[in-house]
């Protein structure tokens, strides 16, 4: 697989894949409920990050908020103008061991 033109997976694609997985296990759950669960999951993730909590999913990875230092000499790439960037917080994801190993094995 070439990394220059990768397929994009949307939330709707994930809902479809989960729905198929559930049906393959002889269970029934409508897609609208799967979408509600996914939306609630992301709201919880965002809420916890905004509360500065660390969110850990064993073997998958860890989400956290980190402080990024500001810079005096940042440049706006569109205008070329130099601007001051203040200290700010960013969401950060650190992959877990399982995920790292699986991604490491991707061919292409």
Swiss-Prot record:
Domain of life of the source: Bacteria
Signal peptide: none
SMART domains: BHL
GO cellular component: cytosol
GO annotation terms (biological process): chromosome condensation
Ranges in a coiled coil: none
TM region positions: none
Classification via InterPro entries: Hist_DNA-bd, Histone-like_DNA-bd_CS, IHF-like_DNA-bd_dom_sf
Pfam families assigned to the protein according to its UniProt record, in alphabetical order: Bac_DNA_binding
PROSITE patterns: HISTONE_LIKE
Keywords: DNA condensation, DNA-binding
Any one Gene Ontology molecular-function term assigned to this protein's record: structural constituent of chromatin
Family under the similarity heading: Belongs to the bacterial histone-like protein family.
Functional note: Histone-like DNA-binding protein which is capable of wrapping DNA to stabilize it, and thus to prevent its denaturation under extreme environmental conditions.
Descriptive protein name: DNA-binding protein HBbu
Organism from which the protein derives: Borreliella japonica
Phylogenetic placement of the source organism: Bacteria, Pseudomonadati, Spirochaetota, Spirochaetia, Spirochaetales
């Amino acid at each position: 697989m070439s990394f220059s033109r990768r397929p994009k997976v949307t939330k709707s694609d994930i809902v479809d894949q989960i729905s198929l997985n559930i049906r393959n296990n002889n269970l029934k759950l409508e897609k609208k409920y799967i979408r509600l669960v996914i939306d609630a999951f992301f709201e919880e993730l965002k809420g916890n990050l905004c509360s500065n909590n660390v969110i850990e999913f064993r073997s998958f990875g860890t989400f956290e908020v980190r402080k990024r230092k500001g810079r005096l000499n940042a440049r706006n790439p569109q205008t070329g103008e130099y601007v001051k960037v203040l200290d700010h917080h960013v969401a950060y994801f650190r992959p877990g061991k399982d995920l790292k190993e699986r991604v490491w094995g991707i061919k292409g």
